[in-house]
Amino acid sequence: MGKIIGIDLGTTNSCVSIMDGGKARVIENSEGDRTTPSIVAYTKDGEVLVGASAKRQAVTNPKNTFYAVKRLIGRKFTDAEVQKDISHVPYGILAHDNGDAWVQTSDAKRMAPQEISARVLEKMKKTAEDYLGEKVTEAVITVPAYFNDSQRQATKDAGRIAGLDVKRIINEPTAAALAYGLDKKGGDRKIAVYDLGGGTFDVSIIEIAEVDGEKQFEVLATNGDTFLGGEDFDNRVIEYLVDEFNKDQGIDLRKDPLALQRLKDAAERAKIELSSSQQTEVNLPYVTADASGPKHLNIKLTRAKLEALVEDLVKKSIEPCRTALNDAGLRASDINEVILVGGQTRMPKVQQAVADFFGKEPRKDVNPDEAVAVGAAIQGGVLAGDVKDVLLLDVTPLSLGIETMGGVFTKIIEKNTTIPTKASQTFSTAEDNQSAVTVHVLQGEREQARFNKSLAKFDLSGIEPAPRGMPQVEVSFDIDANGILHVSAKDKKTNKEQKVEIKAGSGLSDEEIQRMVADAEANREEDKKFHELVQARNQADGLIHATRTAITEHGSKVGGDVIGKVEAALSDLETAVKGDDKAQIEARTKTLEEAGQSLYAAAAAAEQGGSADAASGNAQASKAADDVVDAEFTEVKDDKK
């Protein structure tokens, strides 16, 4: 059995880890970095860039560079959060046929967020494979604890598209708790994991206990906001810079995708700098131009101003902490340790708000960028049998139920129920002689069904005619360890049953996933060919340069026919390099190598001939010296002055 890798698929950055010699190890990517930007770009020549290379070219290719797509995954286009995002990103977001939010390139190619996420997962998979020297097919992938069923299913689909069998979907705060608590001694304790990442926020209250020699991680309660994170903090800075520039120059930079992308990079840098300094300067020369000429943006930003801009966002993260504590039946003073996870927790204002709420300083010995991936790898080790005596008891973050008469949401499984779990409830018909019932499955906390997330609708037909209230229809909910729901409805009298695995009310169909898997495979092959072509070109360019240098150095020493052959081969290769025929480039590279060897051989022979002539001259000089007779002489003193 191969390794089960742990992947933190983040909004801003992603990270991959494996169990190695009983310890979790974070693996560096091909650039030598321990985290990879969750960014995918499509270039005009058809290349797909992932990670740092995609981020570097974002300013010049904003409409085809996709970032923060985790905020779109498993969401409807009409969701308020998606509509809010449209004005903040330079790339296109549109509604797919099933109502889901998809993204679009500048040449109108449409893609599901799952496809973009799959590209990042592929990079993580390749990173692990390069380190292990073997193929990887299984993974544990983390998601925000507050992700609903649609978002979890969509994440699993992304893994499938990337060629991964997702063995488990695990909540990010729970993974961080695993990373923190696995090796810790000191008895039972309750910890709060405050996870403020690039796009999502979670808080989980977790009890770590020793039970019969087994370390048990039990999630007591979880809460959060799947549209609150570092991206929102960045957007506040961007809005401030845009407004200040508009006041000064009368130009709205929101309408310029290129300027917007430069602003995003600058805002993120400024935010990070202000975590360690009191003031920074945002300086963007030639940010735009009008009839009067180019315009430059130069704005000072203080830490105090940044904190004022994001104060409500920080406060917004504290309310779920209060709810989670209440749901767990605890007070802040009952919490032994507070763990910070996610890059945005490096902000001093966030750390202070958390310390004020829980009444204790958060721990600083957990790496906020890597803890989640490490926890995922540990869970992978548990599933593979490599990590013993660890039991993880997670919860469902939101209540699950069905719509009943009058548009009421009737809960069947309450939020914060330990998973996996099953629950059933019996319902009846609303009208006389009703032969079918529609089961509308929902997720959320609102009393009115219409305000909750619709997961699925299905019909149970063939109910025998009877007065209203007489038929007995049993609705059963079954949540697996990934937090994914299966629902069944059964007529108790006829035993007719209808089962459905929730496929995220909308989501991707099996056919779409298969197409995307095939597309990803084809692209992998295409990418491989592209890299091989680039390598062939690079090798050819190196040889062309070396050959030109050789002609300059040795051309005068060899005959014209040798130089003629080399220059002909050189010209042929230069022509081939401009094309896309790898075989032709390689063949002409070989021809030039052979011609170059004949050049070096001729030059060496010419030099040896020159050396022979020099040796002959030296011999004659030596013979002449041998013919000289030594003579005695007497020194004559000249006394004349």
Curated annotation (Swiss-Prot):
Name of a matching Pfam family: HSP70
Any GO MF annotation of the entry: ATP binding
Modified residues (Phosphothreonine): T200
Low complexity bias: start-end ranges: 605-623
Keyword ATP-binding: yes
Induction context: By stress conditions e.g. heat shock.
Keywords: ATP-binding, Chaperone, Nucleotide-binding, Phosphoprotein, Stress response
CDD domains, sorted: ASKHA_NBD_HSP70_DnaK-like
Region (Disordered) residue spans: 605-628
InterPro entries for the chain: ATPase_NBD (IPR043129), Chaperone_DnaK (IPR012725), Heat_shock_70_CS (IPR018181), HSP70_C_sf (IPR029048), HSP70_peptide-bd_sf (IPR029047), Hsp_70_fam (IPR013126)
Functional note: Acts as a chaperone.
Family named by the database record: Belongs to the heat shock protein 70 family.
Descriptive protein name: Chaperone protein DnaK
The organism of origin for this protein: Xanthomonas oryzae pv. oryzae (strain KACC10331 / KXO85)
Gene name tied to this protein: dnaK
